[in-house]
Amino acid sequence: MVHMIEFWDYLVQFLVCAAGCTGAAALFVKSRRQPYFLLACFFGTYGLGTLYWTLHVLLLDVTPQIFYVSELGWIASYVFLLTMEMTLPSAEELRFRTKLSWLAPAIAVPQFILYITYGDVFFNVLMCLGTMAAAWLSIRGLVFSRRGSVLQARGKEDADFASGTAAPVGQPADLRPFHITVLCFTALEYALWTSSCFWVSDTLSNPYFWFDFMLSASILAMLLATRKAVGR
């Protein structure tokens, strides 16, 4: 009973991952599009990490003190997420560079220094590298999408574009919801980890639970964002 809120938090997140995995798998079977397969793997591996915590709290009524089982699942999920971020964009976006992407390490490195004072160095390196890379690619994608939207708007005013002699910018705007969702996901991960360093409580006064509920929402939103990015 002491850990009831914690249990429901993890259970909700696991159910969200299970629903997302089922939905992504169904879309993959229907369309045979690779991003849906990667998304199903993302949901599945992240959900397995959460399931470990859920069962631990349910059966032993205590928060896990050994994180390796869950962290392996979460690190695997970051690999699938990064693979999606490398395969969904166009070749032009992959070549695009922006200095704003450096915001990701500027935020992640100080957080990493904080985390290693509380936890394992090796797994914190892997998890922070994964989330930092995801944030880097998302920021780049958002800047590229903004640039593409501006160029497309200018192109509509161009006579050559109107006559069809100039190529339209294409799909960058379609990836914007996906990049926003991934960026929200990584930001909430950092908020979650940071709150766990300073607050220890099993009540809703602990911001950890609110960040985790929002994280579950961002995980579910990943399915809708990916579907929009894929286009069908």
What function would you assign to each model-found segment?
Residues 136-232:
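C-terminal transmembrane-bundle signature of multipass membrane proteins
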Residues 12-23, 36-59, 70-80, 178-198, ...:
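Hydrophobic alpha-helical transmembrane segments of multi-pass membrane proteins
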Residues 44-49, 74-86, 96-120, 127-137, ...:
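Alpha-helical transmembrane segments of multi-pass integral membrane proteins
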